[in-house]
Amino acid sequence: MSVSSRPGRRRFALIPSAGTGTRAGGDLPKQYQPLAGRPMLWHTVQAFLASAAIDRVVVVTSPGAPALAARFPGLGFDAARLVEVDCGGDSRHASVTNGLAALRGLGAHEDDWVLVHDAARPGLTPALIARLVGAVEADGGQAVGGILALPVADTLKRADAGQHIAETVPRGGLWQAQTPQMFPLGLLQRALSEALTAQRIVTDEASAIEAAGHRPLLVAGALRNFKVTYPDDFALAEAILAGAAPTQEDSQA
C-alpha cells in the first residue's frame, strides 16, 4: 500500500499500541479497554483521521495480534487512511523504531514528518494537531520538530529514599511533555538508533532528538490531552470526551 501524494513533505501519524499498560488495571491492555463505549484507541485514531493535516495514520500493534478491524468490527479500523502494522516491540523505543521502518516500507521519505502519539491520550483533537503542525512548520525549512507540552504549574518536590521531601524543585522553565511529538522521519530514525547504540534510555522521541544535539520546539498542549495511566483516569477521560469537564483547546496548567 503506497502513501498519499500530498505535494511537499507529507505528514504521518504513528501510534505505538503494543504496550500492556498494567498500571491501568483491567483484563485488557489499556488502549483496548472501553472508554465512552468504544476502545480507547478508537478515540485516539479518530482525532488523526478527522485531521486534514495528516496523510496517513499508522498503528503499531503486537506481532500476531488479531487485526483491529476484525477485533473491533464496524468501528472504522479499516479506514482507507489507516494502516496497521504488527511489528511492535518490547518497549516504546522498539515499537516506534519498528514503526518508522514500516513507514519506509510504505514509501515514506527521509524528510516526511512523523507525529508519534501515545495510544493512551484519547483527548487529542484535530485542533491540537493543527496547532503543533502549524507551529513546527512555521519554524522554518530547517525545523527540527517539536512536541505538545504544558508549562508545569504545580510545586515540585524531590523525595529522599524514605519518601520524605528532600527539596523543592524550582519549576521555572519546566514543561510537562505530551504527544504528538513531530520530527522528520530520517532524523528520528537516526536519533533512536544512536540512543540504542549508546544504551541510553529514552522515554519519548524528544529525548532522543535532544541527545543528538537538537532543540525541539515546545508547543502549548491542553489539559485534556493527558495520558490515561491509572484506573481513576478512565472516569476523567470519559468526562472530557463527553464534554462534562473543561475542554478548551487553549487551556493550560
Swiss-Prot record:
Enzyme nomenclature, EC number: 2.7.7.60
Site description Positions MEP for the nucleophilic attack, residues in chain: 171, 227
Keyword Transcription regulation: no
Organism domain of life: Bacteria
Substrates-to-products reaction catalysed: 2-C-methyl-D-erythritol 4-phosphate + CTP + H(+) = 4-CDP-2-C-methyl-D-erythritol + diphosphate
GO biological process entries: isopentenyl diphosphate biosynthetic process, methylerythritol 4-phosphate pathway
Site feature location: Transition state stabilizer: 23, 30
Location of region: Disordered: 1-28
InterPro entries attached to this UniProt entry: IspD, IspD/TarI, IspD/TarI_cytidylyltransf_bact, ISPD_synthase_CS, Nucleotide-diphossugar_trans
Pathway linked to the protein: Isoprenoid biosynthesis; isopentenyl diphosphate biosynthesis via DXP pathway; isopentenyl diphosphate from 1-deoxy-D-xylulose 5-phosphate: step 2/6
Protein family per UniProt: Belongs to the IspD/TarI cytidylyltransferase family. IspD subfamily.
Protein name per Swiss-Prot or TrEMBL: 2-C-methyl-D-erythritol 4-phosphate cytidylyltransferase
Organism this protein belongs to: Ralstonia nicotianae (strain ATCC BAA-1114 / GMI1000) (Ralstonia solanacearum)
Name of the coding gene: ispD
